[in-house]
């Protein structure tokens, strides 16, 4: 299965099927074994069993992402072109996008209008947001971003919800969903969200961050998407797997 040749690798994300080949990306330090100098690593496969490690898809070479190209998502846009959506780590945490320069998806070019989201929405004290997940409902593209709410007696995880007509211009809507750690044990901040319709229901997966001895864990709820909010069937989530070793799930339709 997928295995990097060397150095730091974590958080696989952005699973994509294009022209008969699967692509997946990851946080990668190409020159050292520690978490730092983060770019987007890239693997490709014809069958999801045999993987080739490609050159990094994105590197931090602009002011708005100078502190790292952090996790995000990949989609096929309305023109049938793959598009990367990533967390741009600059002086503030924002969102950047990129487009391929070749059909093999080896070379990528950042959008000239980056960052498409410059920073977190007004009214929230936490400054970090990360890990986009993007999907389409009808004619509207939606994006959620992992976040946390600090300005309460009980800090908790949350998901910022944005929408767009073209995957370039994004408007903040509200919080898609908030946790309640006293009830659901979902922690103070959520990473690597996935929001996927399966059958007639939606599955929301989040990764709570480790905090005060509580380990990271991938949890999920099943529910509905109504009035641009997630409504869980049960306020208490389930654990995605038993031994707590899966922390950045990705999904793709084939």
Predicted regions and their residues:
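Beta-rich carbohydrate-recognition and catalytic domains
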Residues: 1-131, 135-185, 197-244, 254
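Acidic/histidine-rich catalytic neighborhood
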Residues: 194
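Repeated scaffold domains used in trafficking and secretory/extracellular systems
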Residues: 247-249
């Amino acid at each position: 299965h997928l295995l990097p040749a060397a150095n730091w690798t974590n958080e696989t994300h952005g699973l994509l099927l294009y022209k008969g080949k699967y692509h997946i990306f990851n946080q990668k330090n190409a020159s050292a074994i520690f978490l730092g100098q983060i770019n987007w690593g890239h693997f490709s496969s014809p069958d999801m069993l045999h993987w080739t490690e490609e050159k990094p898809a994105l590197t931090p070479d602009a002011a708005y992402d100078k502190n790292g190209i952090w996790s995000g998502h990949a989609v096929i846009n309305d023109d049938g072109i793959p598009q990367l959506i990533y967390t741009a780590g600059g002086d503030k945490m924002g969102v950047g996008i990129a487009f391929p320069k070749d059909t093999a998806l080896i070379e990528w070019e950042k959008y000239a209008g980056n960052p498409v989201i410059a920073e977190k929405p007004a009214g929230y004290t936490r400054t970090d947001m990360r890990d986009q997940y993007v999907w389409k409902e009808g004619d509207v593209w939606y994006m959620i971003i992992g976040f946390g709410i600090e300005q309460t007696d009980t800090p908790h995880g949350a998901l910022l919800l944005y929408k767009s007509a073209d995957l370039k211009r994004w408007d903040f809507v509200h919080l898609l969903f908030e946790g309640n750690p006293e009830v659901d044990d979902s922690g103070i901040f959520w990473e690597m969200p996935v929001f996927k319709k399966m059958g007639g229901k939606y599955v929301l997966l989040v990764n709570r961050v480790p905090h005060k001895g509580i380990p990271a864990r991938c949890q999920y709820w099943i529910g509905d998407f109504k009035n641009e909010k997630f409504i869980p069937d049960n306020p208490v989530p389930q654990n995605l797997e038993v031994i707590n070793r899966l922390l950045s799930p990705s999904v793709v339709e084939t």
